[in-house]
Regions:
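Active-site lumenal/periplasmic loops and adjacent helix-entry segments of GT-C-fold
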Residues: 11-178, 211-215, 386-392
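Membrane-interface transmembrane helices that cradle and orient dolichyl/undecaprenyl
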Residues: 172-195, 300-302
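Membrane-interface alpha helices of multi-pass inner-membrane proteins
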Residues: 181-183, 194-211, 222, 315-320
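Membrane-helix boundary/interfacial segments in multi-pass membrane proteins
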Residues: 17, 23-37, 154-168, 254-287, ...
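Membrane-interfacial loop-to-transmembrane alpha-helix junctions, especially the N-terminal start
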Residues: 1, 120-123, 192-195, 199, ...
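Hydrophobic/aromatic-rich transmembrane helices and adjacent perimembrane loops
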Residues: 215-217, 325-353
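Signature aromatic-anchored transmembrane alpha helix within multi-pass, membrane-resident enzymes
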Residues: 238-249, 345-383
Length: 393
């Protein structure tokens, strides 16, 4: 798949540039997206390689505190590195490549499952991977006015471009999330023992990697399953929702207990994860072209995308709940929005004349990709200058 090769190249290009062109004496370390987080993952890998258990401590705090179950992927990588006598960073780099590949494959399967046609699926894939919002024109407008304006937060909940540069647990979580949605949110989902076991494995993996958004997705599965059951479209989704909830609880409950009842971990990671969602009107800046197309295409969405719409609505509600990590609750919603937008774009283009349809597609591509291209250039430039760009710091 050409897109898979392109994403692999983009993900590795900053590392290649830093290896050949960074300032003399500097070495590449960590990730180029949310670079401040990598020290915690490195510490978890080191602790995993030095101990038999899976609990970790916060090595960056002198305060006395208990151990916690955190960052299991990186603890596991550290253990494998110790057993194989290879550097943990090498395994982490290989995990990055694998995670990005799995994410792109899962995204394509997701787009094919819910898009109205193969051409709409291709549009959805490109919008999900490279589509941004109106950040660039908004920034230009603010410069003209001479005042600071909101120009987007570029978090991976609202822009999947960052998943091509993020630490491996995030694209892995996105891959398992999209695969779970693909298997469970469509009508007529089969409820075979093997299928339910796969569902349980996917939701357990997602809960271990990125637990914040799991309740919204499982809740969407439950609501959609009830509708499908009551309208005679099978019980597969409802059974999958029950299994998913049971599989998620053993992971989610200890996580909630640790960060709600333990004073140290609660204070440490509440302060670190202050992640407010954009105000509703600011979503136009973050996902403008896709949001406008999706609103246009809601009435054109077929019955097969009903589950997708319910998940989007629940994610939209969840991301404004009064919790510190608001926008984490909408993880996975951007690809869903891209599919609805792509369906609308293809449907509208089909009823326009050839020239108008081409102009519409070109306009959407320019509007959606302009900000992503600018940030991508910034990422690559920072690899040469050894200076992380604040937009993705």
């Amino acid at each position: 798949m050409p897109v898979l090769a392109l994403t692999f190249l983009l993900g590795e290009l900053p590392l290649l540039l830093s290896a050949c062109c960074a300032p003399q004496g500097a070495t590449g370390l960590g990730t180029v997206w949310f670079v401040n987080d990598f020290a915690q993952y490195e510490a978890a890998m080191r602790q995993g390689s030095e101990q038999q258990g899976w609990l970790v401590r916060d090595v960056f705090s002198p305060e006395p505190h208990g151990l916690a179950f955190m960052f299991p992927l990186y603890v596991g990588l550290g253990k494998v590195a110790a057993l194989a006598h290879v550097p943990a960073e090498l395994l982490e780099r290989l995990a990055e490549v694998l995670a990005r590949g799995l994410f792109v494959v899962a995204l394509w399967r997701f787009c094919r499952a819910f898009a109205s046609s193969r051409s709409a699926a291709r549009v959805a894939l490109l919008l999900a991977l490279f589509g941004g919002g109106f950040e660039l024109p908004t920034a230009a407008f603010g410069a003209v006015l001479g005042r600071a304006v909101y120009v987007g937060n570029w978090s991976y909940e609202l822009n999947s471009l960052g998943l091509l540069f993020a630490a491996p647990h995030v694209p892995l979580a996105a891959a398992s999330t999209l695969e779970l949605a693909t298997r469970s949110l469509r009508p007529g989902a089969a409820a075979t023992p093997r299928g339910l076991m796969v569902t349980a494995g996917l939701v357990a993996a997602t809960s271990l990697l990125h637990p914040f958004h799991v309740p919204a997705l499982v809740g969407a599965m439950g609501l959609v399953g009830l509708v499908y059951w009551r309208t005679g479209r099978g019980t597969g989704t409802l059974l999958a929702a029950v299994v998913a909830g049971l599989a998620a609880l053993p992971v989610l409950l200890p996580t909630v207990a640790t960060f709600s009842l333990d004073a140290f971990w609660g204070a440490t990671y509440t302060a670190q994860n202050l992640l407010p969602s954009p105000l509703p009107h600011e979503l136009l800046v973050d996902v403008g072209p896709m949001l406008l197309l999706a609103l246009l295409g809601l009435r054109r969405t077929g019955a097969g995308a009903f589950g997708l719409i319910i998940w989007l609505l629940l994610a939209l509600i969840a991301m404004y709940l009064p919790v510190p990590y608001q926008r984490r609750l909408a993880f996975g919603a951007q690809p869903a929005l891209a599919v609805v937008a792509a369906n609308a774009l293809v449907a509208v283009a089909a009823v326009l004349g050839r020239r108008r349809a081409a102009a519409l597609r070109l306009g959407v591509a320019a509007a959606a990709a302009s900000s992503s291209l600018l940030v991508l250039v910034g990422v690559l430039a920072s690899s040469v200058r050894n200076a992380p760009v604040p937009v993705y710091r």
